[in-house]
């Protein structure tokens, strides 16, 4: 990459001495000091000084130098306007923000540079362009307020969505909330404590996002409440149960202010408000989402995951909604039950053997455009002509959906009601937009013929130019008798009549010479000059007229935005339900049933992703297994060889519970599920070097979090806990953790271990049972049967697994001999230690003199003076005690 010597940016407060254009640039840059400013100049967006150096480095484009301003070299680089989306995408991916500055004035309309202004700011959390967005994922902007009373306020939205969400969470749960929301950008106050800021930065390790600092005054609860009321068009937030959330209101104030600033206007399309509270959702900590590979594999890939298996949606709207369902299962079974009933209706076939409704509906949904995002871009006045054409086609498709939809149940009935397109919208789009419009309004060719008489006339002048010239040429030849006279046009000299040297004597008096050539002369006539003025201006006037008409069209579409947003929600819900119906049919899943008593009962359960991968590779069928957990059997202690299927079994149970909780059918012959409040997992191990945490430290940290959080309604997966330290340490810790989960948390627990000593745990803990994954030996080889069977495993088969992995024969033989010696020695010296005995009760310490004196005080009966005297007395007593000690 070509570079020049780095130059500091000029002062943005003193523009004296700068050229008019650079003074204009610096004035705009002063309002966006921390943002790259794309300054439109003709066919390029230019960047100057420090912005240019940064952009050139990040984008690997040429950095150059052109002239001077105020005695300083003007360092610059640029990108073509027609390719700007490509460069924006690269910058946004790097966490940068870009202010887009356009020419808004007419060239030559005033002295000095053409008028320019920043029309929008593109940041990672406020993306609106379809080229910059992922069809299947929301780009969320989150604001966090440090809050009071040890609570944090959160407010978040997608600028291209229609819903704003609020929450207040305990300060110690903030990281979990951030991880679940998974924002693209997080806003926080410039006046938070260093410790709080460090927590936000640390949270990026689990969920990468851009941090943006905002002035503290923007986080104002009163301002937020007013903004929310205005946004919802109401004097009170009581209808949304959002009136007493001062911390969340403060976050919403900053959120809305920032979003409006970046878009250059209010978010009129955001008209839904919801409040999420602790206890509403089934908790899925970051470790659970990672270990179950819900939306990303352990290698960071998008497939194969549970979401990639589920997502056969026909629209981006449906995919995004399905992902939200998957990551936000609700404890209240009402929504899940409604979805199960809807899936049943979509799968039912009417008498006569016609196709199930989900098949017909999916065909109709195919190629439906993203109505949700198009509606948002209409409201933000950023929609492109071809998106409006796509919207018209989507509205036509929507009209076909309701008749094919069974009116069964409240959920499907509500979808039918919301599928009604806004009145007159499709007709307006059909009359206004060409069937094949240009990509951009600035290119013309967008407004349909017949929509505006003045535009049609201007187009006719421009389009009929060739016909006029041909007719003029014929008439002039007849009038002058010059047979080779030609009427033509070029961009330099405009329209002209060309006559060869031999015919110049026949040129009429009204011909005025325009250009002399070697063998000919070119002339202009008053008639041709008048046409030239009209024709050349007609194209510019037609383009200006089209731009004006397009703005008028956007004005006319604004009242339809709420109905379009409602329609988008209905299409998304229907699409997601049809995808679940298709998955159930194709993968042979069954509907779960919900019960009020605690249980997880699964017959012939399967891991859906592993099963699908086996089918792809033709590697044989998946071995299904039963699971029985209830009040009398809350824990399974699972033993068996590596590669035997312990982790797969544990994960499949969690996935089946999760799928049932979102209202999906499940990969099992049958499933009964009681109340579930969380799914916790401690599976696998990896160092966190960035945060100076070893494998074992991470293991213990995650286990501690589970022990503090798990309840009797939680599902806990513990896989090989205690591996990262010495054998005795690990065994002792594993025993203690198992006892805590069994005796105190009473959570449904799948506890996989290689510590054979733990198979004695169920003997003293009546709600625990031993289970093992079966395997058999064939000579010196091992055959994995992948079946869960009662009782402990007879051996771990570690040496056989090492042999299968390709370990050198000498190493395997040495290990086998060493194992035999160790087992013999262990059998002779094994101590009878009760790993599962409760710890001895701690002695109750005697109360100190200070504690006794403090307990004797009655603060309510004391005057302020008496309280102060008592405090001094306690201080003296404490000093004496410390001295005696």
From Swiss-Prot:
Binding site for ATP: 640-647
Gene Ontology BP term (one): mismatch repair
GO cellular component, one term: cytosol
Keyword ATP-binding: yes
One MF annotation (Gene Ontology) recorded for this entry: mismatched DNA binding
One family name in Pfam for this protein: MutS_V
Organism superkingdom: Bacteria
Keyword Transcription in annotation: no
Keywords linked to the UniProt accession: ATP-binding, DNA damage, DNA repair, DNA-binding, Nucleotide-binding
Function: This protein is involved in the repair of mismatches in DNA. It is possible that it carries out the mismatch recognition step. This protein has a weak ATPase activity.
Family indicated by similarity: Belongs to the DNA mismatch repair MutS family.
HAMAP family the UniProt entry points to: MutS
Name of the protein this chain belongs to: DNA mismatch repair protein MutS
Protein's organism: Variovorax paradoxus (strain S110)
Gene: mutS
């Amino acid at each position: 990459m070509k570079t020049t010597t780095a130059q500091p940016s000029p002062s943005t407060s003193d523009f004296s001495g700068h050229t008019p254009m650079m003074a204009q640039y610096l004035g705009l840059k002063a309002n966006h000091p921390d943002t790259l400013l794309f300054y439109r100049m003709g066919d390029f967006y230019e960047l100057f000084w420090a912005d240019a150096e940064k952009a050139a480095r990040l984008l690997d484009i040429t950095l150059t130098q052109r002239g001077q301003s105020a005695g300083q070299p003007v360092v610059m680089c640029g990108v073509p306007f027609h390719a700007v989306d490509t460069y924006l995408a690269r910058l946004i991916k790097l966490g940068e923000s870009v202010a887009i500055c356009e020419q808004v004035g007419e060239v030559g309309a005033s002295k000095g540079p053409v008028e320019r202004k920043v029309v929008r700011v593109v940041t990672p959390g406020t993306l609106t362009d379809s080229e910059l967005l992922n069809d299947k994922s929301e780009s969320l902007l989150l604001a966090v307020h440090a809050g009071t009373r040890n609570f944090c306020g959160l407010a978040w939205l997608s600028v291209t969505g229609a819903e704003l969400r609020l929450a207040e969470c305990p300060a110690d749960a903030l990281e979990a909330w951030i991880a679940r929301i998974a924002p693209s950008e997080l806003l926080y106050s410039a006046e938070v404590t260093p410790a709080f800021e460090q927590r936000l930065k640390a949270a990026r390790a689990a969920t990468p996002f851009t941090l943006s600092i905002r002035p503290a005054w923007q986080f104002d609860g009163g301002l937020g409440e007013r903004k929310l009321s205005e946004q919802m068009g109401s004097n009170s937030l009581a209808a949304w149960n959002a009136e007493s959330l001062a911390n969340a209101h403060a976050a919403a104030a900053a959120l809305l202010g920032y979003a409006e600033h970046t878009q250059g206007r209010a978010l009129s399309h955001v008209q839904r408000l919801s409040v999420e509270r602790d206890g509403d959702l089934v908790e899925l900590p970051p470790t659970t989402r990672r270990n179950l590979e819900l939306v990303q594999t352990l290698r960071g890939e998008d497939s194969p995951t549970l979401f990639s298996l589920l997502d056969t949606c026909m629209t981006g709207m449906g995919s995004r909604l399905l992902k939200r369902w998957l990551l936000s299962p609700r404890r209240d079974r009402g929504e899940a039950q409604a979805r199960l009933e809807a899936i049943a209706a979509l799968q039912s076939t009417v008498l006569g053997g016609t196709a199930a409704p989900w098949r017909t509906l999916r065909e109709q949904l195919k190629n439906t455009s993203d109505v949700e995002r198009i509606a948002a871009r209409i409201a933000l006045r950023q929609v492109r002509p071809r998106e409006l054409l796509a919207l018209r086609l989507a509205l036509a498709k929507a009209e076909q959906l309701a008749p094919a939809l069974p009116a069964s149940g409240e959920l499907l009935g509500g979808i039918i009601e919301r599928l009604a397109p806004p009145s007159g919208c499709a007709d307006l789009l059909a009359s206004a937009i060409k069937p094949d419009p240009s990509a951009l309004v600035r290119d013309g060719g967008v407004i349909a013929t017949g929509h505006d008489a003045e535009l049609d006339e201007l187009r006719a002048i421009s389009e009929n130019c060739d016909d006029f010239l041909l007719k003029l040429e014929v008439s002039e030849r007849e009038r002058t008798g010059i047979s080779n006279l030609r009427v033509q046009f070029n961009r330099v000299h405009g329209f002209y009549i060309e006559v060869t040297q031999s015919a110049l004597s026949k040129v009429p008096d009204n011909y005025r010479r325009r250009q002399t050539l070697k063998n000919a002369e070119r002339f202009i006539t008053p008639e041709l000059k008048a046409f030239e003025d009209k024709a050349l201006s007609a194209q510019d006037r037609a383009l200006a007229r089209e731009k004006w008409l397009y703005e008028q069209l956007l004005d006319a579409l604004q009242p339809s935005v709420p109905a379009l947003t409602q329609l988008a929600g209905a299409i998304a819900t229907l699409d997601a339900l049809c995808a679940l119906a298709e998955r159930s049919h194709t993968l042979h899943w069954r509907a779960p049933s919900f019960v009020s008593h605690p249980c997880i009962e699964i017959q012939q359960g399967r891991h859906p992703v592993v099963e699908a991968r086996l089918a792809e590779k033709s590697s044989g069928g998946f071995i299904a297994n039963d699971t029985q957990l209830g009040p009398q059997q809350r824990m399974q202690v699972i033993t068996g060889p590596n590669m035997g299927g312990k982790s797969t079994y544990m994960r499949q149970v969690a996935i089946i519970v999760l799928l049932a909780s979102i209202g999906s059918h499940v990969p099992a012959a049958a499933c009964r599920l009681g109340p579930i409040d969380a799914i916790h997992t401690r599976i696998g191990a990896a160092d966190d070097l960035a945060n100076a945490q070893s494998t074992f430290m991470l293991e213990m940290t995650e286990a501690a979090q589970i022990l503090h959080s798990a309840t009797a309604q939680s599902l806990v997966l513990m896989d090989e806990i205690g591996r990262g330290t010495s054998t005795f340490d690990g065994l002792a810790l594993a025993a203690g953790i198992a006892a805590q989960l069994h005796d105190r948390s009473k959570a449904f627990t799948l506890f996989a271990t290689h510590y054979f000593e733990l198979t004695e745990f169920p003997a003293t803990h009546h709600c625990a049972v031993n289970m093992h994954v079966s395997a058999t030996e064939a000579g010196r080889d091992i055959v994995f049967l992948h079946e869960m069977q009662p009782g402990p495993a007879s051996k771990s088969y570690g040496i056989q697994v090492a042999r299968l992995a390709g370990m050198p024969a000498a190493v395997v033989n040495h290990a086998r001999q060493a194992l035999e010696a160790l087992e013999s020695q262990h059998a002779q010296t094994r101590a009878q230690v009760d790993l599962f005995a409760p710890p001895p009760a701690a002695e109750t310490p005697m109360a100190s003199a200070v504690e006794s004196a403090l307990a004797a005080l009655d603060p309510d009966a004391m005057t302020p003076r008496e309280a102060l005297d008592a405090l001094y007395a306690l201080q003296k007593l404490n000093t004496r005690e410390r001295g005696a000690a």
